[in-house]
Regions:
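Cys-dependent protein tyrosine phosphatase-like superfamily
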Residues: 1-122, 127, 134-186
Length: 186
């Protein structure tokens, strides 16, 4: 499993982000944040093209199937124009809720497999705060941090995202924070 969670000072990740409501978990490789689509199809296409130009080819959507306007077909069309294979995964977690332990385990395994195979990953929910933060926190614990360290690291990474100005902490609920603090895979 890839556990390079350090930030390379030669990389300026903020300049590489495809949009402001996101943050790097592993600079240049693992991005997390808000829903990448918008109600306007043209703007969604432009935004998704920025993601693709960043090299992100694995998308982990934590929203429910009918929760937001789907973007996976537009993503596939734009990726096809760039001759870039992409995969859109859906791991549905209820808004402000918690996944089952098994779902989180499967999600983390899929993210690790993508990173181990040199893919670039984007994990998102609607706002990029609760479900996304819970996933990132558990990822950090999986890769050697304590729950407290993971929450501290998550706070520092999330502070670089645009939405942190309006919602200052990730994850969103006390239950989501406790899920990270208590995460283990035994």
């Amino acid at each position: 499993m890839n556990s390079d969670l350090s930030i390379n000072p030669a990389i300026h990740p903020e300049e590489m982000k495809p949009f402001r409501d996101s943050y790097w978990v592993i600079p240049g490789r693992f991005l997390a944040g808000a829903y990448p689509g918008l109600d306007n199809m043209l703007t969604t296409r432009k935004r998704l093209t920025k993601f693709l130009q960043t090299g992100i080819d694995r998308y982990y959507n934590l929203t429910g199937e009918h929760e937001l306007v789907p973007y996976d077909e537009i993503l596939a069309e734009e990726a096809n124009l760039l001759q870039m294979p992409v995969i859109h995964h859906r791991f549905s977690i209820v808004d402000r809720g918690l996944p089952s332990k098994m779902l989180m385990f499967e999600l983390l395994n899929s993210i690790d497999a993508a990173l181990d195979n040199n893919h670039k990953v984007y994990v998102h929910c609607w706002g990029g705060i609760g479900r996304t933060g819970t996933t990132v926190g558990c990822y950090l614990v999986r890769h050697g941090m304590s729950g407290e360290q993971a929450l501290d690291k998550l706070a520092a990474m999330y502070a670089t995202a645009g939405q942190s100005r309006f919602h200052p902490r990730s994850p969103e609920t006390r239950e989501q924070m406790d899920f990270i603090l208590n995460w283990n895979e035994s």
